[in-house]
Amino acid sequence: MKIKTRFAPSPTGYLHVGGARTALYSWLFSRHLGGEFVLRIEDTDLGRSTQEAIDAIMDGMNWLNLDWDEGPYFQTKRFDRYNAVIDQMLDAGTAYRCYCSKERLEALREAQMANGEKPRYDGHCRDSQCTHGADEPSVVRFRNPQEGSVIFDDKIRGPIEFSNQELDDLIIRRTDGSPTYNFCVVIDDWDMEITHVIRGEDHINNTPRQINILKALGAPVPEYAHVSMILGDDGKKLSKRHGAVGVMQYRDDGYLPEALLNYLVRLGWSHGDQEIFSIEEMTQLFTLDAVSKSASAFNTEKLQWLNHHYINSLPPEQVAVHLSWHVEQLGIDTRNGPELVEIVKLLGERCKTLKEMAESCRYFYEEFDAFDVDAAKKHLRPIARQPLEAVKVKLAAITEWTTENVHNAIQGTADELGVGMGKVGMPLRVAVTGVGQSPGMDVTVHAIGQARTLARIDKALAFISEREAQQ
């Protein structure tokens, strides 16, 4: 049997982390078994579906490198197919027209709730012999079995059973002629030969209805697996209140796709005590029986830890490609300075995100307007004039600009002055970067370049002179 899974988001908002995890699990399951993965856009909610949301879904999937073998399919382009099946069901008697008014249905609902009953359709039109005009508004309902039960073996949760008496006759076509979500899903899974439906636990109650429709059509029933929800660190359902955002916001905030994928796969799935998984390892190891039934809590600190790991473990060239986007967003021109690969090597240990790295690398490429106030107050004092003048002479004398020669110049200055490296290095750091923290001075000065370094030392010496004049 060819394995075939699908990811079927509704384009009513961004691709959130819960949806991304579902997509990842479906993708991994199919890839692990050599199957196919389908992308389907369930846009039947015409009032809420937007092109912007569709674009956000596609951008998120592409950024995460979750490629698909078929699609994207759009439900709004398949209405003729859905309605043709509904007409066949009307002819076969597995569906019927319902002419109940909104007023009758509302009164029924209120009466049931007043009696402590679960609101459900009472089947008024199910076996009605009443005649109605051809133009009288009606919906079409599925004739759900009234006896027995629906049992399915959830691949994460085990056997789940629903009594058919608990399931009312579902509307499958509205009065305006449009098919409903629960029906479209069934026909899509049938037509697209989906073998395994992996989705959120909020769809469990839809499953028995969908299975009954499939059986009425004589269609194969796929396997189902319902993934538990993701909670915030306070134990409540993850929402915007917890900072839950679309997948692309994580890109904007400086996270690598490899880090987010690694984090998402571990939100419910495990393989021993292993924490770090490449996409190749995930594909090789992923199985549904290792997915937990329990809800998972989203922890931003853990994601940052993983991101820092991948910044420093992936090839610098690969990280630099992602970094370039962030640098461009800040308007930094990198043509006059070190390659971004060097920035990754220099700042990787210090930065948890690429956004932080981009914001920290500006002094490698641009002149700064002013020194950091606290750093200058502490390190650009009159006492710093001598070490800055001395190290400038040695740096200016270098004919081969290497990290080793820069280091020797700084160390040699400290030795000649009989002071510790910090007495030279800290004023030099503030002079050439404008701030009080940076990577080691030898690699930083080397990356900034000889001419720019000497000019910045002059700027710092002028600053010290101005400071002296004001005292």
Swiss-Prot record:
Binding annotation for ATP: 240
Family: Belongs to the class-I aminoacyl-tRNA synthetase family. Glutamate--tRNA ligase type 1 subfamily.
Species of the source: Yersinia pestis
Residues annotated as binding Zn(2+): 98, 100, 125, 127
Top-level taxon of origin: Bacteria
Pfam families with a match to the protein in the record: Anticodon_2, tRNA-synt_1c
Entry-linked NCBIfam families: gltX_bact (TIGR00464)
Catalytic activity, EC: 6.1.1.17
Protein name, per record: Glutamate--tRNA ligase
Annotated localization: Cytoplasm
PANTHER family assigned: GLUTAMATE--TRNA LIGASE (PTHR43311), GLUTAMATE--TRNA LIGASE, MITOCHONDRIAL-RELATED (PTHR43311:SF2)
Ranges annotated as spanning the membrane: none
